[in-house]
Swiss-Prot record:
The lineage of its organism: Eukaryota, Metazoa, Chordata, Craniata, Vertebrata. Residues 302-394, 523-549, 684-711, 757-805, 858-892, 1025-1049, 1550-1599 form a coiled coil. The gene is pcm1. This is Pericentriolar material 1 protein. Residues 1331-1345 have a biased composition (Basic residues). It comes from the Eukaryota. It comes from Xenopus laevis (African clawed frog). Residues 42-58, 149-162, 1127-1136, 1221-1247, 1771-1784 have a biased composition (Basic and acidic residues). GO terms for biological process: cilium assembly; intraciliary transport involved in cilium assembly; microtubule anchoring at centrosome; non-motile cilium assembly; positive regulation of intracellular protein transport; protein localization to centrosome. The keyword Coiled coil applies. InterPro entries: PCM1_C, Pericentriolar_Pcm1. Belongs to the PCM1 family. Residues 1-484 are annotated as: Self-association. Its main location: cytoplasm. It is found in: Cytoplasm, Cytoskeleton; Cytoplasm, Cytoskeleton, Microtubule organizing center, Centrosome; Cytoplasmic granule; Cytoplasm, Cytoskeleton, Microtubule organizing center, Centrosome, Centriolar satellite.
Amino acid sequence: MATGGGPPDEALSDQDLPNWSHESLDDRLNNMHWNGQKKGNRSAEKNKKKFVECDLRLTNDISPESSPGVGRRRARTPHTFPHTRYVSQMSVPEQAELEKLKQKINFSDLDQRSIGSDSQGRATAANNKRQLADNRKPFNFLPSQLNTNKEKSKSPPKREASTRSLTKDFLASALNKDFLSNSQAFLEEESKREPAIDSSQVVSRLVQIRDYITKASSLRDDLVQKKDLSVNVERLSNLIEHLKFQEKSYLKFLQKMLASENEEEDVRTVDSAVGSGSVVESTLLTFDVPSEASDTTGVDPRQEAKEELKNMKKQHALLTRMLQQQEQLRTLKGRQAALLALQHKAEQAIAKMDESVVTETTGSVSGLSLTSELNEELNDLIQRFHNQLHDSEDPPAPDNRRQAESLSLAREVYRSRNSSTSDTPLEDKSPLFNNVGVLLEKKQKMDTLLGELHTLQDQQLNNTAFVASSVSPRRSTEQRTLGSAVSSALTSDNRAARSPVTIGAYQTASVNESEDEENQNPAEKLKKLKEVRKRLNELRELVHYYEQTSDMMTDAMNENTKDEDETEDSEYDSEQEDAEPTTNIRNPQYRSSWAQMNINSNNQSGTNNRDERQLNTECEINNRSAVNLRSFNMPSALDCLYNIEHSDKEEDGNRELDDEDAEDQGSRASLSSQNSVADDVQSVDFEQKFNRLVAAKQKLKQLQDLVAMYGDDSESEPVAPERSFSGDQFPPEATTLKQQPNNTRPNVSKAQKDIALKEQAREKFYESKLQQQQRELSQLQEERKKLIEIQEKIQTLRKACPDLQLSTSSAGTNPANRQNRQMTTTTSTPDVNTNGNIVVPAMPDPEDSSSVDNEVWSEIRKHQILREDLRQRRKQLETLMAEHQRRQGNTETTSAASIRSDDSDTQGLQQQTRTEKTMATWGGSTQCALEEEEEEEEVDDEECLSDVHQIDIEEDEQDNTSCENNSYPQNSIRKTSFNGRSSKDGWKNQCPLSVEGNHRPSPKTRQQQNVSMRRQENYRWMSELSHVEEKEHWQEQIDQIKKQLDYSTSICQTLMRDQQALSYLLQSMITTPYSVMPSNVGASQVQLIMHQLNQCYTQLNWQQSNVLRLKQMLNDLLVQQPQHLQGESHQREDRGSSAPPLTSPNIFPNFSFLPPTMNLLNMPAFGSIPNVVPGMNFNPVFPHGFENFTQNVASHTDTPLQPHDQNTSGKTEYMAFPKPFESHRSNSTEKERNPPKKPDESEQGRRVWVENHQKSDQEKKPACFGAGLSAGGASAKLAEESRKVKQFDEVSVESLSSMPDPVDPTTVTKMFKSRKASAQASLASKDKTPKAKNKKRKVFHQKSKGIKSCGFQAASASSASEPNQTTCKHAQTEEVVVGNVIKTSSAQRVEKESKATEMSSEAGSDVSMFETLRDTIYSEVATLISQNESRPHFLIELFHELQLLNTDYLRQKALFALQDIVTRHVSEGNAKKHETCTKALESTGWMASTSELTPSESLVTTDDEMYAKNSDGPVCQEGEQNDGDNISSLSTSSNFEPFATDDLGNTVIHFDQALARMREYERMKSETENGLVADCCNNLNAAASSLEGTNDEARGRAQHSVDDASGIPCPYIDSKQLDRQIKAIMKEVIPFLKEHMEEVCSPNLLTSIRRLVLTLTQQNDESKEFVKFFHKQLGSILQDSLAKFSSKKLKDCGEDLLVEISEVLFNELAFFRLMQDLDNNSTAVQGTVSRKPEAVVVLESFTKEADKEEKTCPEENFSATRETDDEDKDKDETETAEENRNFDAEVLSGKSDISEEDDLDESLPVSISFTKAETQALTNYGSGEDENEDEENYEFEARPVDVQTSLETSSEIADETEKEEMEVRPEANIENEKALSLAVNVMGELSIHEDQAKSDCDVLAHPSLLLSNEKATDFSGTALVNNVKSPVDSPGTSGAGSSDTESPVLVNDFETGSGNLSQKSDEDDFVKVEDLPLKLSLPQEQIMKDIEEEENKNNLCDEILNINDEENGADQLAGDPLALKEPDSPAIHPA
């Protein structure tokens, strides 16, 4: 600062400086990131990594990490301090924008105390790392120091060293070089610029600039504070940097001006200032003022400028003098200023440290005189060192480099950058070499003082405990840094001359240690610290000097520095000590005997930093604590540990070498440091410890190998090696990760501990850990034995089920397990370790992790890559396994897998919960967590071994690292958890059959889940977390319940033994034709057996009452879990629980009857047992829908009514669950209604089964997996099937679809088989989670699939769980909509809840039911909320509605209402399904299932298709479902989860009323128009069923096959039509938006947009009230949705706005259309409108489903494409946001409609991107089909009429083609289209398909189109006409034109005779025959004939299901695409 340029820079930076000084060092470091300084290297890298971690911390560790320094930091940087450090010249708009961003981003201060001051600073710094470089360099000296203190408070260990180094480097380097060079450069530059400019102008400019900087800084700080590390922050940082540069330039210029004026004066002033420190003061005036200002919330920039002017005058003098002075003086004075700053900081820090280690800001500078003296002495020393450097050999220089490096690699870099500069000053300072001797003496004294200070600080820190430790590590680091700096100089001296300084260093080091040991009193330490304060300041100055010296030396050594690590290590090692050259690069630090502690720590840090930051951090941390304590030995030990770790990774020999080296080095260091004894002792200890570690690691490896050998047998063996490798390789890293946190903590704890105590404790810990590890190893060995036994059992199971086991276990599980294990080892270890890190030391760990050396990171990266590879392979394996399982006993495999999954999930997930959570933070960690769970569960023992191995290593290392206590406890915890898992696994192993059988499949299942979960890894993540947490909460309960169940099982077994005969009878009967039991087994026998079983149950009932209560809780939990795939996992776990009972499957099979009751509760738990027991299966039927069982028993075996009795007895308690199963009961009730047809019922059961099955398929797959492994023999297989059925039923109980099977075991068996593929697929989605990758995913996936309904169901179910109340409303609506779906899952849950509530009331567990459900409800609600974040109004309304369900009575009433709806719908729907669809199983499967799952219909359809696909390629299924999940999650996650529509939420508000109204209207219209009064909308339930499964539509189908076919699709809502309609609307909206693109979204504009949209979506339906209701709802939703865009520039939010509008429109129109669709004859359209929320929910599900199905069906071949579409649409959503700007014609062109085709043929204007529309309501513009943008515009203009209605959308492809044609020849097209539409409408069948295929219209819009058409047909031919494409439809009509949407466009289906034509008679709306494409030359009669033929030939279900077969993707485009004239807009496919 005395240097000419320095003051201006400082003055410039001073504003920043205060802030920086207050900000974390990282901020300054990062921001300043002294460009030329070496600090950058290590400290910069550290800072970078820290910053990375800061980011992590900001995200993860902000509070904790920053918490240590919160108070401190807060004290330093008053939160009140304006963050306007960096005021930048931001334009007002930019500032406003930043403000907006800040406000927007500033969700919370992120604990601004910590973040604002530190994290924010760090984040800002990170953003500004290089930006402030020169600007803040001077300032950073003080800020660095101050911040160093802060940093001490923060992450003292890590930042400490970097801070010290940075500070020193900054001070030395920055002052020397930046100030000198930069200042001069600037000054000269300025002088060159405008020396004549008035200083006042410059001052005003400076003031302005500083004001800008302040503003920009504040903005950036705010942004950073808000974690907004966005481009804005970077821009701000750049701006600030630029401004500061200008400021600097102006200051320099001003100073130069002033200097020119006051040059002489100032020279003298400078001289005096130098002596008196006024220079620093003058330079610091600005600093201090700003710092004070920052402390006092900022000084007016102008005041600052004025003060700066004053300062600048002074500084001008300084500058003048600087100009006069040589760079030597400038460097010296810069150093002086830096030293003064450092001293000031150090004094403050010391004072605060003394006062309160936390408070580190006070303290008087040792004195300017000292500084000046030090400057002189430093100059002398520098010269001497410089001379010595020249005189000395290179090795000393490398040593210095290394030590300097230890000081700071960054510094070296800086030095290398500024080497010439510092050399020059050094040369200038050559006269000072004379003073080197004196300075060396002083330095020795300083070193001694440093030693004392270190001792005091260390001791003080130790005494001060954590606070002190946090500070002292820093200080120690500082001192070590100082020492290392001194040592660096000394080392160079040592090598060069072995100068006394070196001796001083040694003495200092020894003194430090001795003092560390001696001065352990905090008081003494404080005193000495105070005394040492000056000394420390002096030492700091010396450090700076040394840094400078090292800089000079480094400059001299820079060439060498680059080769320093190895070369210097070798040189240094060889020179210093024996040549342990490169091997112990880490250890050279130790080799740096002179500064063993410091250098070890520093070099360790430095070298390790180069190599591995984390390790450096460890080392630093350890060195900070340990080095402070035993920095010498600790670093050695740490290095040894570290080296051993890595050496272990590399070679034990290397470890030993490293240990020896470390020991030798430690000894050498000790000898060098004269503390050889302690070091030797420690080194010996460490050596022993290391040997122990090595031995332990070897043992662990051996154990791992053994475990690997035994774990998977042949398969595990390769895995074990992998794991060993991964474990050995990565775990050390992981260990390092753990260690680091451990080190971090131990630093604290050990900081508290004395060195000796630490060593002793360390030894104790090592011993204890070794003992524990030995115990754990013995445990692991025992577990390994168990695993071996399990393996044997598994082998037995494999023999029993060779295909299953081999394929599942071997092919899938084992490879997966290998991968999983390896992943587990890798993932688990890293993740687990990470968990340990994150969870336990999470805050420091991220830093450590982030700080971990590049090596660690590279290895971690490698492991992650390997993990990804493993995941990919696992996915492949899962795919193969899924197919294999499908081919093989899907049920068996699935059952076993499910069981296994349950076990593994239960056990694994419980503990994995954290792991998963933690892992979630790691890329694939979540999956890894799951995999780990699997692995850990299966491989827990092995994993534990590996983990223990790692842990042992970690523990040893950590112990060595002095992280023993914390490390080991964590490790112990991990081990405990692992052992717990192992124990659980052991327990599972105790139940090897189901457990193992499940064991292996489970990994598969879980792998499959993981497959899809990987895709939706993040998605699953949420619900899983909640579920995992829930699991954690109730896992114990589950375990207890399982124990009780086991106990009950044992009792039941005893009872069953008493009834062996019955068991045998049951088994024999069941073993005989499985269906015989329920259907044919002598009723008397069955009754007798059931009666006896009931007696047994009665005996057990008291137990079961308890067990049932527990099980009810379990089931509730499980119900929740099914909702979350984890629920299924939990069920799997429960199955696992039941799996333990499975250990006595035969007994339980006998006892299975009890299990039914228990199985209802136990189904998950005893699910295996039920599976085991065919007879049990008989009961599983009951358990599955135990209600159903009772009913079904009544149906199947009236005697089983005793099961009824069971139900009665168990049912009272049990009823709660049967009630949840009452959906099943509904099914079973239907089946019971059907019972007369028990065979039929079997069939119906099949159908229901199919429906359920398809639902269940998802569930059944898990069931299949679970069951698959359950049994070993035929009976076992049967039992498995029973088990499967049961598990399936369990799962299916989830889906309620198993019931039919349980009801009719035959059905179950048959359906079970038929389900295998689909069930597996479904299970994959549900159980496996791949389908429903998350339980959320499950919901989503279901959602996405039409699982939308299911998902919706799940959502409803979730809601049903908590929002049971809302679900009652929603579920009523939804169940009306989703009906069966919700009924199935939601109703199941709800029924479970309601019945459980009932039964709970009956069982006295009413509260417990809801309490049990509460977690699920919370998780569901959390999921719901998270998924509906985009529609807060929905959530608000939903919760408002839920709040209304404030009593159990209301809840039960709602649940019962749902049950009634579901039951009625199921009974009616199933009857009609069976009646209506002969394609029954599949058609009915998905149609009936659709009835249940109206959205799920698509799900089912999608499932069937997907199942077929999945059978063909589970990947597609997963992908599709993933796409569906993603899409539905994306589009419907907000839409669907929230019950698929925001509207639903709004609707829900008055949904009952509106729904009642809508239903009434629907009823009226359906009566009047459809004549389907009784069938369609006669009942709300009819409407509900129409909504649900379109059962009414199914009824309609019964009346109208077209209506039937279309009926299903109707609720299925053609997303294409919707997409088209929305596009049409958006075509109008987008131009409007474009017109106002530059405007701000004012309320008026938004209102105009809303009105425009509403106008475009005007429904001309007769049912004005529904239309009004719809529009009112839509308007309110639009208003709500658009409100968030208020005050934003349209161009900024236009995409989002369009997306929002399109999403809302899609939801609303889909709902509206769904409501219409509910009116199978578009009569109900009005009702639909009123019911739209419901309809939208289902509709969206359908629409998405439909899109998915359309994609699925038409695109079966395009499945991938569809997936791609979905993905693309997902992308498109994002892209659409971008492309939304392009959204004009493209999207509107209906391209979204042909999204599939777009994927196929981007040129195709039509794309079924409505998935985007689904995903992005705004598919219209945002469908990502922007390429059609022009076309869309053209279409808008060319055929504004051609607003595609949803009907039109269904024919969207055709329409697109037609559009192309129509645009080419719109009228003819319209006519043809209209004719076709009419024909299609009349036919309403796939014939349209053909006709349209014939006709240019790609009516081939396929089933989806047909669906749409059928919908339209149901609603009106208009829909088909629209589908065909009513180009006439105006954009508005597209919104309102489609009959589905009641858009005027709807040309009523003449067949339906709905008034839609008249209603929609708007000419624009009418698709006129003349408007139809000319290509549609077929007369209407011909078309109708074709349609009829097509319809006769093709069932819509068949068509949809078979679209792949019937139509290729190319064929899907009906008509001759080549015949289509390319529309003007190129977007339309030129074909």
